[in-house]
């Protein structure tokens, strides 16, 4: 390092001597010999060099010609001169080994001085000769009064061995002095070596890594040297500047640290980073067998086993559908490799075996081999036939809208009635409309309505008894080899009394579609009828009436007086209730009230022209006489059996003119006919629902049988038997029945619920407006759209009821009850006032 830049602020040494200052710029003079020390204590060369920068007095010397160097108060201060200053000069002081010479850009002649330390007793300061270098010497002209100077010094006595050992310990760069360091010269010299200008530009794009090395300071050296603090300070400044130097070599190793940092005392434990960029390949069966013991012990120490998920049964449709896409959550470790690799049947899993256990344990290896149940189920594509069969065992959940769309029986019955109108399709109609079969070859007759016995759907679930239990389908065998069967079906309408609203507690059963059945009998005209004498039931008188216009006989009877059901015994009441097709009722009062309501209903529907016969009172006194309440058999007449078969044209004519069979009519002996045809009456226990305590909106249905006689001029003949099944409480049937009847009856208006349903279904489709579809109310219900009660009530009162000929009006409250009964999603219209909704009364 330059001698002019080495200073120190330490205390003055005891070897201070008077030194004559040398002023740069003075005229050349011969070398001066200065005595620096006494022979007893010879100074060191470093002390001699430091003494040249001090003056014996505190006088301030005059500045030189260039105004560069000044000496104030015994301390030399250096001031940097700008580059454009022509008087700037660079000085170099040669040390004991090298001689540095620098050339300035100033055109003036520079002065050089040298300090030569000669081993001896003298320090010689002398002049240096100018060196000439080609073209450069021409530009550098010497000024007057400026000359090169050299300093020569000689040590008076040789250093002792102790001082040499002390100097050898101190490095040459660690020079201490009492003066402050010369920052200017240090920056100039280091700027050329460190390339600070390039480093500053490079710093904008790159920040050097933080210094990871810990400087280690020799404690013994600090105690032995009085300038330990200065040495540490100089090293700190030097390393701070040298960190920003670019050596030209880029270190690629990450996380490398010097050995000195490992030995230095630290408070943090270094962490070793492991590279996971490469995953070990799946070993082959031969390789894994040789290395599985080593890998099993090492992998168990380096990883943590993940908690296995608990197995759960697939209970939802979503879990079944997404099971084949589920992937087990496992870590990338040896377990995952072993699961993917093919396993031999007798091999044991490495992850489940402890590290100390050897593979030679074959006995336990077999017991630990289990089938893999943790994986997702294997998805198997089934054939189409098996897939269709799976739908039969699937539990289907239907909403009320689906019932309204597909489950209502009137749609099927309408299709059946259209097919029945054609005579050629009588065989096909027999299988479509009738859920049971009647024949004389021994076939069973099912007693279900609307396919109740065939399929367990919502209609069968709705057939319940008084206790709430589901009805069981009863199958009655009507096999009778000695005679044929003649079946005609009607339905009975039972109106309640004067209790409650007029249409609220109505049990209304409409007509059923016609079904033509063949009549086969093997009995002769004069057959013996004594075997079925006990099966003849005298119910009420049959009044046949022959109409000249339609050539059709209508059999109607109307009792004059109401029977006193309270005088009947309990068994007689039970028989009468069973004759109407109801389930047995335990309460006597409930049976009496039910029979009275049924009698009133029949009396309203009877024709006023019908007249009772003589056997009416006898039938009431005798009651019912039959062995089986579900069978009603009547003997056929010989004349009737002779004329039993009629032409097909007559059958087709009777079928087209057949409007609706009368309601359930009790049968008793008639004076107009010698005998009666055998009739079997099927009374199903689940075909009608009547509540004991109160009759609700539940619709009861029954199947009754009525013979239809045609007049040929010679006598009465049984034409055919019809079975018609139709939706209960259908307004169309009521209107057609009212129009077809010869006389006007007193028929109460239909219920508002049925009228609302009819009005909603009768609404035509609306055309799209500006490309937007306008769904009808029925379509909104099927799409589960919320129905605003006020809007639906307004539409019914203005447009809906007008299409079906209904004059009444409904309010939002009635519409709400209808929506809740049908399961339709309904909401109130938002009102600004916020007052609560009240259910309006309907008159």
From Swiss-Prot:
Give the compositionally biased regions (Low complexity): 739-748
**Which GO biological-process labels does this protein carry?**
DNA recombination; DNA repair; DNA replication
Q: How is it modified after translation?
A: Phosphorylated in response to DNA damage.
* One protein family per Pfam: Slx4
Q: What does this protein do?
A: Regulatory subunit of the SLX1-SLX4 structure-specific endonuclease that resolves DNA secondary structures generated during DNA repair and recombination. Has endonuclease activity towards branched DNA substrates, introducing single-strand cuts in duplex DNA close to junctions with ss-DNA.
Asked whether the UniProt record includes Ribonucleoprotein among its keywords, one would answer: no
Record-linked InterPro entries: Slx4_ascomycetes, Structure-sp_endonuc_su_Slx4
Its protein name is Structure-specific endonuclease subunit SLX4
The record's GO molecular-function terms, alphabetically, read:
5'-flap endonuclease activity
Q: Where is this region: Disordered?
A: 26-111, 281-313, 339-377, 603-655, 729-748
Domain of life here?
Answer: Eukaryota
A GO-annotated cellular component: Slx1-Slx4 complex
Composition-biased stretches, type Basic residues, lie in: 302-311
Name the protein family: Belongs to the SLX4 family.
State whether it acts alone or in a complex, and with which partners, per the record: Forms a heterodimer with SLX1.
């Amino acid at each position: 390092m330059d001698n002019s830049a080495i200073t120190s602020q330490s205390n003055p040494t005891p070897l201070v001597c008077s030194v004559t200052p040398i002023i740069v710029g003075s005229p050349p003079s011969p070398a001066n010999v200065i005595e620096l020390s006494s022979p007893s204590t010879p100074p060191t060369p470093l002390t001699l060099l430091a003494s040249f920068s001090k003056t014996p007095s505190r006088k301030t010397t005059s500045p030189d010609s260039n105004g560069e160097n000044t000496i104030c108060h015994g301390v030399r201060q250096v001031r940097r001169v700008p580059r454009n200053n022509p008087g700037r000069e660079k000085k170099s002081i040669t040390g004991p080994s090298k001689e540095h010479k620098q050339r300035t850009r100033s055109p003036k002649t520079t002065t050089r001085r040298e300090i030569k330390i000669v081993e001896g007793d003298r320090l010689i300061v002398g002049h240096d000769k100018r060196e000439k270098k080609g073209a450069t010497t021409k530009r550098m002209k010497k000024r007057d009064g400026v000359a090169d100077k050299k300093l020569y010094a000689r040590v008076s006595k040789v250093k002792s061995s102790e001082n040499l050992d002390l100097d050898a310990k101190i490095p040459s760069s660690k020079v201490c002095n009492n003066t402050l360091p010369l920052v200017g010269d240090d920056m100039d010299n280091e700027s050329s070596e460190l390339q600070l200008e390039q480093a500053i530009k490079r710093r904008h794009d790159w920040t050097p890594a933080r210094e990871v090395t810990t400087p280690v300071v020799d404690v013994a050296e600090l105690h032995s040297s009085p300038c330990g603090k200065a040495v540490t300070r100089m090293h700190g400044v030097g390393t701070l500047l040298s960190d920003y130097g670019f050596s030209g070599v880029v270190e690629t190793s990450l996380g490398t640290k010097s050995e000195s940092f490992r030995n230095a005392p630290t408070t943090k434990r270094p962490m070793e980073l492991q590279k996971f960029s490469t995953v070990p390949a799946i070993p082959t069966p031969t390789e894994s067998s040789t290395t599985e013991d080593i890998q099993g012990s090492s992998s168990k120490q380096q990883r943590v086993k993940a908690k296995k998920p608990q197995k759960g049964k697939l209970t939802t449709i979503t879990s079944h559908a997404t099971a084949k896409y589920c992937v087990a959550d496992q870590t990338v470790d040896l377990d995952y490799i072993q699961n993917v690799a093919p396993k031999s049947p007798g091999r044991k899993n490495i992850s489940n075996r402890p590290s100390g256990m050897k593979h030679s344990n074959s006995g336990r290896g077999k017991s630990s081999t289990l089938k893999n149940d943790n994986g997702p189920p294997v998805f198997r594509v089934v054939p189409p036939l098996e897939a269709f069969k799976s739908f039969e065992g699937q539990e289907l959940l239907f909403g009320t809208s689906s019932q309204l769309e597909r489950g209502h029986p009137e749609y099927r019955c309408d299709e059946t009635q259209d097919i029945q109108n054609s005579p050629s399709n009588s065989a096909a109609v027999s299988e479509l409309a009738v859920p049971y079969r009647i024949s004389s070859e021994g076939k069973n007759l099912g007693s279900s309505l609307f396919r109740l016995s065939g399929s367990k759907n919502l209609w069968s679930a709705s057939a319940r008894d008084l206790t709430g239990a589901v009805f069981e389908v009863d199958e009655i065998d009507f096999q009778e080899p000695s005679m044929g069967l003649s079946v005609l079906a009607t339905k009975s309408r039972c109106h309640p009394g004067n209790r409650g609203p007029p249409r609220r507690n109505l049990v209304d059963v409409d007509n059923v579609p016609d079904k033509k059945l063949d009549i086969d009998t093997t009995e002769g005209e004069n057959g013996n009828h004594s075997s079925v004498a006990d099966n003849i039931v005298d119910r009420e008188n049959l009044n046949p009436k022959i109409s000249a216009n339609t050539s059709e006989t209508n059999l109607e009877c109307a009792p004059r007086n109401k029977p006193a059901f309270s005088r009947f015994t309990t068994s007689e009441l039970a028989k009468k209730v069973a004759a109407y097709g109801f389930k047995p009722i335990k309460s006597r009062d409930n049976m009496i009230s039910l029979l009275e309501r049924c009698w009133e209903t029949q009396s309203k529907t009877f024709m006023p022209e019908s007249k009772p016969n003589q056997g009416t009172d006898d039938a009431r006194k005798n009651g019912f006489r039959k062995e089986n309440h579900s069978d009603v058999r009547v003997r056929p007449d010989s004349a009737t059996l002779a004329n039993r078969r009629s032409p097909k044209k007559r059958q087709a004519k009777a079928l087209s003119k057949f409007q609706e069979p009368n309601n359930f009519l009790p049968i008793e002996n008639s004076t107009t006919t010698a005998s009666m045809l055998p009739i079997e009456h099927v009374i199903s226990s689940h075909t009608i629902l009547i509540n004991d305590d109160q009759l609700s909106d539940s619709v009861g249905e029954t199947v009754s049988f009525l013979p239809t006689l045609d007049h040929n001029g010679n006598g009465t003949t049984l034409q055919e038997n019809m079975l018609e099944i139709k939706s209960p409480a259908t307004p169309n049937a009521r209107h057609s029945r009212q129009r077809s009847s010869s006389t006007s009856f007193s028929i109460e208006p239909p219920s508002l619920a049925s009228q609302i349903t009819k009005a909603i279904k009768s609404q035509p489709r609306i055309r799209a407006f500006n490309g937007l579809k306008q769904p009808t109310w029925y379509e909104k219900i099927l799409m589960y759209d919320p129905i605003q009660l006020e809007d639906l009530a307004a539409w019914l009162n203005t447009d809906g009821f007008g299409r079906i000929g209904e004059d009444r009006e409904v309010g939002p409250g009635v519409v709400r009850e209808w929506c809740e009964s049908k399961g339709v999603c309904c909401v109130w219209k938002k009102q600004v006032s916020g007052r609560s909704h009240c259910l309006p009364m309907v008159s």
